[in-house]
Amino acid sequence: MQNNKNYTEKFITDKVMRRDYSKIKSNFEGPNLLEIQVESFKRFMEKDLKEVISSIFPLKSPQGKYTLAFKGLKIKQPTKDESACRDEGKTFETPIYIDLELTDNYTGEVKRAQRNTKTGEDGIYLGAIPKMTEKGTFVINGIEKFVISQIVRSPGIYVLGKSSIKLNGSRKRLFEGKICEIYPSKGTLMLGYIPKDRHNIQIVARDSSGDNAQTFSVTTLLKAFGLTSAEILKIFNNEKEIRESLEIEKYAPEYIFENSQENEIIFKIYSDAHDIHEKADRRESNNKLKEEYIEQGSPLLSKLKQLIFNYVEKNDEIDALLHENKDVEDASFIKNNKKLYDEREEIINCIISEKAAKDIVELLGINIKNIETLRHLGKASYQIALQQHFFNKRLYDISSAGRYKFEKKLLLSERLYQKVIANDIIDKKNNILIPKDTLITKEHIELIKKESRDKNIKWTKKINLLPTALESEIEQFLEYESIAVYKDNDLRDETTEIVGLASGCKLQTLTVADLVATTSYIYNLNYEIGEFDDIDHLGNKRLKLIHELLRARIATSMARIEKFINEKLAISDGSSNNITNVNDKGIDTELDREIEESDMSDEEKKKAISVKSIINTKQFQSLVKDFFNSHQLIQFIDQQNPLAELTNKRRISAMGPGGISREDPNLDIRDVHHSHYSRICPIETPEGMNIGLIMSLASLAKVDENGFIVAPYYVVEDGVVKEDYKYLTAHEDDNYIIAESSVQLDENKRILDEQVVARYRGSTGLFSPNEVDFIDIVPKQVVSIAASAIPFIENDDGARALMGSNMQRQATPLIKPYAPIVGTGTEFKIAHDSGMAVVAKNDGVVEFVDSQKIIIRNDNDKLDDYKLIKYRKSNQDTCNNQIPIVKVGQRVHKSETIGDGPAMQNGELALGRNILVGYTTWRGYNFEDAIIISERLVDQDVFTSIHIDEHTIQCMKTKNGDEEITRDMPNVSDTAKRFLDNQGIVLVGAEVHEGDVLVGKTTPRGNVETAPEDRLLQTIFGDKSKTVKDSSLKVKHGQEGIVAAVKRIKSSDENGSELPDDVIEIIKVYIVQKRKIQVGDKMAGRHGNKGIVSKVVPIQDMPFLKDGTPLDIMLNPLGVPSRMNIGQILELHLGYAAAEIGKKQLIQIAIDQLGYEKYISLFGINEIIAKKLYENISNLIKHKQAKQAKDIDLIDVTIILKELGLSYDDIGIKISTPVFDGANHDDIVSIMNEANIDIENNKGKQVLYDGRTGEPFDGLISVGLTYMLKLDHMVDDKIHSRSVGPYSKITQQPLGGKSQNGGQRFGEMEVWALEAYGAAYNLLEILTIKSDDVQGRNQAYNAIIKGHDVVADGMPESFKLLTKQMQGLGLCITVETKDDRMVDINEYTLNQNRLNNDDDEVILDENLKEINDSNEEIFNTNFNNNDYDDEENF
């Protein structure tokens, strides 16, 4: 052993120890890899579900008689457990009950839903929501599914140079300039921008019809919300762009009453108001006329009319005073009556505000009927309609993520960096925090952020609105912060006002302050204040997880339920149309209702309305069911192996509803971005059309409460790396200097380098340690969990690493899996978090273990029972089996792995086997990536896997009678029924082949009229063929195997199975196949080195090493240089060295008398076997009197291992070489020296001998241990042939594909090949009777049956089509017959069809005669055999 170790011995579990060659040591415990699914659904059930359901309540009837209030929510436990749902094809779901209270506001009577007699539950049954299993999946109709996370553009504000608004019919309207997009989660996209070569600021929004995008000045919108021109100029400090915007729009006192097309409505109301005011002599008549006029027409105009009347009255009042004081100077009069003039000005501003709101509402086509406040017509106005459109969360929602983005963009602290301030920044005590003329640096920004959070900076102001503007003022709606900065840092001669949001706003709706701050941002861009957004930056994207998708779906269902309840309440209230109607008799229906209610008894009144009668929950149930069955983001979980399942749950898709199409060629969307660092893996993505649209989360990444992907970093203070860590979003990354994890640290974790490489604002540079804010946790945090399982990935080309990541997910679990000798240290974490391993829930001691279950007594003295999954079929038809890895009396801790799942060994991921591989050619059999394997891999089941097929049959009730499960089916041979029991169901353990019956079933035929004597004969001989037909479940081609289990599910089961009404019974038969590796199967390493098995060579013919060890696999050495995946060569040598050291250690441990426990931790073998092995090796050492390992002959050790059922596959030290931080060249040289491998003379290569001749090959060859996988692409699933089968209705050519029993396509190039060889007759057959010559193939079929010669003389359908197309071009097509006659093609085709039809009738008659003859033979045979009892039948 070396004294100076360049590795540490890391105990993964009690049975697994790995040499860890990582240079960067970290105790960071990453998040649970399933957290993205489990925590999201937990949030939905605990918070979101109740929020969404309660959001529509309380509901009141139009006349205010009834109120329906929400009182609570109950989530019950599922009625069936997970395994029962899986077996019966049911959904694992939790019932939801809501408690509602209906109050009669007239009588005070309160009603609640009565207890359900069937379920015994209080409240209304709302529906059932599928419950997430512990491993993050849903069982839907017996099948495990999961929800893929969707990456979408985050709501918020974006500053762009170009933008577009989508219109109907795939049209777009493009804009260029300085653009601020306000992008809501729900609502209309709105752009604020300065057009090119212009200075005014405009707003663009799509109208409700979607046909056009409407443009208007930003000041028009601000005025519509209640700001005056003076207030706007005050907020923006008289900025040029604002002045120009005010000048362009016509909403000013001098324009508002002019007789123009724009002001037509105001001019008319003004004229009418003036006339009414002049006509009336008395105050009372004036008020009455005014009220009548205001109530006429649209209720939305009532406020505008009222304001104009107020203006007319105020104007008359001023005119009257002027007339009385006509001798007084104007200036003096105005000064003395300033209040009157101010009141008139305020009224004019209110008229302008309401007119602006009216114009925007009409321009955008805002639907005023759906606005809640308009139900009470007294409050109706265009200003309220506009406010409801933009400030109501149900109509315009920017979400918590949008609010976060607004703050990140519009806060002053985010916009002052590298700007010189023109005012002092002072705190609440008037102390100067930052003096004016200071250039704002990173340190100043941190100070501003801190003081802003504490509300300690004196720069917050409030927007002053007109008194009629907002119904209820919310302080956060109106608060903003502002400061003046110099336009030019050097000249410092002009200033501009930066207006930002007030910090701490939590509203998820748009606010007036948002619009003001956005306007400021637009004109500030002229002076390089603020920055343009990169739309592909990950900070501008977020994930929609399961809770958000479900929340949106349930919100839709609750909106429909709300509509239904409102209709029912309106009817019960006697106001179904919200208006008092008159009936046929001319009597007011309000009076009718009172008469009817007086006639009703008290009992009838109580029954008139109830909670159940006004709610219909079917919408909830159907939408939830539809979501889990047909939503684009719900997918079958990939259960090929633990890594596949885990990767599936951490996958991100840019496709889905509202997402990107896979046909979109945009490379910017698909490309890797610098902001993906530590958040999205740059390697793992599919090949093909979906490349870049399907991504995977990085190893340590999480998702925060707003849906943004966050990555962890250690905090650095004064050049010292702290134990604390922090999760940052992609935008927060840009604000900090973040160093790589590879920097040199001393024992106190102080950075030793004078300059370190670090990232800041998207670029990399050199920084001093004191400038660094954070440091990466570990290098592997850049890549996904699949990529982090590939050793030496840094030595592989990116494309090959991508293939390696994807192919690991396709690895088939083997019957005896081995963890890789050369691993990366992530194997345990992947297996543990995959959900396929058995994990202890509590600390405790194991009390009982067998193959079916583990019982642990926990520290609370309670028993935890863990049932193990045994030979369950996965979604990919692989075998899901769990085995215990603990023993009785063993102490276990919470979260410890106590049972292995498929593709696991001792708690570690074990996708394949460690195989002795040589890179050499061998007689051309490994040409073009083909793989040559040894027969040992077949005989010793090294790459043997188990596959389970499920075959299901339903016994139904039909209109002709019930189907029957029976052994007695008509026209089925005894051979096909040989494995059926008395009930007609196959026996467990039977080896079945194609055509064998698994479940016998008969279906009643329709009523067929039969003669009495025929019925008598059927009764006598038990011939059921006339009354029932065979509809049995049979083994299909390629599905042979051994019957592993049979499950019968009846509707009358004690378990309470619920089957559809027309189903009597469901029977499921599980057939197991044991597939050995064979020619045509696909294999791969972990570095994208894939190939097809081309030849299985006998062990004695395989090339062998100097000690006689034969190779297991031969790979082509030409597959390495051009692919640039050198990682496989490093793995090869490191693996071989580790195996050789393992052989030495096996003997050395016994020589040093270290005890058998060392075998358990080093090699991970069973305790009993370890004891016996240690004893046998010790006896061998004693017998040989060996002093060191080289004194023992390895053949003797091989015999000892063989006797204990072991091999050298079980012996070998395990290596951990993490990605980007693993074993380097010196480490590999060191371990190879330790293994006594000669690297100076032969560079680690070996002399290889030909197994056939015994002669050494020319040159040295790279030989070593490589981890090889058997992939899911097996030849048994792909090989296919057909003689006859289905044909396409349209083309009459054979269907394609194995699933449809289709034919092989003989394409254009294949035709060329036959032409080249002159194989005319073969070509004729393929293009005619084997394709679409209908009559020809019928004749050929008949000729084959009769034993006649096959003559193909028909006309293919495709040729007929060709002639028709030529005729369509105006060409005359004729046929020259044998007797030299020229016949028109149409006539010739008609004659051919007539002749062929005649031949077909002859063939049909002959075939029917044969069938009848054969039936008579069967009948005679049955009669002569006397298979009946005389007494019983006669």
From Swiss-Prot:
Q: Which InterPro entries match?
A: DNA-dir_RNA_pol_bsu_ext_1_sf, DNA-dir_RNA_pol_bsu_external_1, DNA-dir_RNA_pol_su2, DNA-dir_RNAP_su2_dom, DNA-dir_RNAP_su2_hyb_sf, RNA_pol_bsu_bac, RNA_pol_bsu_CS, RNA_pol_bsu_protrusion
**Which SUPFAM superfamilies is this protein grouped with?**
beta and beta-prime subunits of DNA dependent RNA-polymerase
Q: What is its EC number?
A: 2.7.7.6
A Pfam match is: RNA_pol_Rpb2_45
Q: Note whether Lyase occurs among the keywords.
A: no
Q: Which reaction equations make up its catalytic activity?
A: RNA(n) + a ribonucleoside 5'-triphosphate = RNA(n+1) + diphosphate
Annotated PROSITE patterns: RNA_POL_BETA (PS01166)
Q: Name the GO terms of the biological process aspect.
A: DNA-templated transcription
Which keywords appear in this protein's UniProt record, sorted alphabetically? DNA-directed RNA polymerase, Nucleotidyltransferase, Transcription, Transferase
Q: Would you tell me the Gene Ontology cellular component terms? A: DNA-directed RNA polymerase complex
Drop me one GO molecular function for this one.
ribonucleoside binding
Family classification: Belongs to the RNA polymerase beta chain family.
- Partners and quaternary state? The RNAP catalytic core consists of 2 alpha, 1 beta, 1 beta' and 1 omega subunit. When a sigma factor is associated with the core the holoenzyme is formed, which can initiate transcription.
Q: What does this protein do?
A: DNA-dependent RNA polymerase catalyzes the transcription of DNA into RNA using the four ribonucleoside triphosphates as substrates.
Q: What is the protein named?
A: DNA-directed RNA polymerase subunit beta
Q: What is the lineage of its organism?
A: Bacteria, Bacillati, Mycoplasmatota, Mycoplasmoidales, Mycoplasmoidaceae
